Amino acid sequence: MKKIINPWKGKEGYNCFGCAPANPVGVKMEFYEDGDDIVSQWHLQANYQGWINTLHGGIQSVLLDEICAWAILRKLQTTGVTSKMETRYLKPVDTTDEYVLLRARI
């Protein structure tokens, strides 16, 4: 896997909740290219819980939204914003696990 360099890192005003490394409350995602896939391994943190030992659904949506945006950026060489997102959660994400692995493909 090859790490994707964040083109906005260090730019004035860049404070993305999903991927800005300097955002003190953000999730600070990093991304890698693995063939056709964009991958992120995000380390779970108890301060993002919605319920005891359960990752908040809004944070799960952020992780999904962010990796999709990076797939668009990397594979289509353009940026965009989410206009609609519908999510059905199949099972809870346990915050006592070490990490969650996200993978996106166009």
Each predicted region: which residue ranges?
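A generic structural signal for short beta-strands and their flanking turns/coil linkers
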Residues: 12, 25-27, 36-40, 58, ...
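Short, charged, low-hydrophobicity "junction" segments
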Residues: 13-15, 55-58, 72
